[in-house]
Amino acid sequence: MWNSLHMTQARRPLMLMILDGWGYREASEGNAILAAETPNLNSLLNEFPWCFLECSGEAVGLPEGQMGNSEVGHLNIGAGRVVYQDLTRINLSVRNGDFFENPVLLDAISNVKLNDSSLHLMGLVSYGGVHSYMTHLYALIKLARDKGLKKVYIHAFLDGRDVPPKAALADIRELDAFCKENGSARIATVQGRYYAMDRDKRWERSKLAYDALTLGVAPYTTSDAETAVSDAYARGETDEFVKPTVVTGSDGKPEAVVQDNDSIIFFNFRPDRARQLTWAFENDDFDGFPREKRPKVHYVCMAQYDETLDLPIAFPPEELENVLGEVLSKQGLVQLRIAETEKYAHVTFFLNGGQEKCYDGEDRCLIPSPKVATYDLKPEMSAYEVTDEVIRRIQSGKYDVIVLNFANMDMVGHTGIFEAAVQAVEAVDTCVGRIIEALKKAGGVALITADHGNAEQMENQHTGEPHTAHTSNPVRCIYAGKGEVKALENGKLSDLAPTLLDLLGVPKPEEMKGKSLILNE
């Protein structure tokens, strides 16, 4: 099929274009995708075959009903098989009791007992299931209780993106009540993920988070965690943006700070937003900001955050063999991965099965994301710069396969600001039109799809509040280009890699359990 066109002197690129957050929803209320002017995508949907792909729940290795996300989506896309996610693995471990015998977690507890020190549990206090899950925190609290620990402190990072913007007050109340019923754990600090979970090296944010944890110094102090959240709401801050707040005792001193010989368990399982704080604690060569204090701690990562750091991992990664990038490399094909900063890790690390390695023949291009506080201030983000560069790469004639991600619909969708999301959709549509035109001139074709939904639902239909989380809606996949493809059948994200290989005429490895979406009839 495609290989008959491909095996000429001039390479005709096959592109996988991932429009992050481009979900499908028929209802128009709060639907930024339907509200936007999208002549290019509309034209492609009318002209070329397309299908629906499932991108949430069991279709991507998550619990039934759990919304998808970018990490999960790109893992499944690259693997060509359903990849059972850390959330699913850890949930099962809690249910069957293995969690409470996990040797890495038990080592952290043994360190506390040996040194008569403290256990710090830090992470996102959320039922979102994207970066963490409340059940895992509760299991850690029970484990500490069962092992007789008395000094257990929780550093609560608040969500507001993968759940409603003001979900934290109820979650903190629930957590506080659970702590009182299950041992002696107490909440020591509260702050929004904007500070504690930055991933774009905005070190001034990470420093505020780190100082609250290690020095007990923060913009605000409070007598209890619930008051910290309600005071933040009174200041006009939603969960994501709650400024670091230290909980103090009756003596006015911090409830707890991280000290030498303490143990830390960072209970987030998704790596990208756990790295910066981990580097601040554990990287000897860290230069993001001056560390006034660097306690020597026993530091445990719930999952692998950075393979260059030799840290204990409670749930280490399961290696995936023969992912898309590896198969293309073995075939001697030249591939490009391109995205702006916000999604660069997704088209590289996650698409390669959660591995940092770069395959032979794999080029990578990172376009910096704009340095703005929130992306509603610049809905186009760096899409135009990404487009200029990818067109230049298409015209170079160097690449057989190009994987591109546009971050806009997801990142601007997370702000909950409808008008900005509409502008984001329109910016991406303009870019899609330019790229497809360049592909046509080069004799190339594209599969245009998404990893999950977001911008199609910007409003909570029950409360009228902004909807800032991903959705569980399906996404579309368009075959855009001339050729033999007449129809596509519905599938899931793990069918994309087999489809790309089918188009290239490359045999699918047996590890890939997905199917080609191409209907031959």
From Swiss-Prot:
GO terms for cellular component: cytoplasm. One of its GO terms (molecular function) is phosphoglycerate mutase activity. The lineage of its organism: Archaea, Methanobacteriati, Methanobacteriota, Stenosarchaea group, Methanomicrobia. Mn(2+) 1 binds at D410, H414, H470. The keyword Ligase does not apply. NCBIfam families: pgm_bpd_ind. It comes from Methanosarcina acetivorans (strain ATCC 35395 / DSM 2834 / JCM 12185 / C2A). Its EC number is 5.4.2.12. One of its GO terms (biological process) is glycolytic process. This is 2,3-bisphosphoglycerate-independent phosphoglycerate mutase 2.
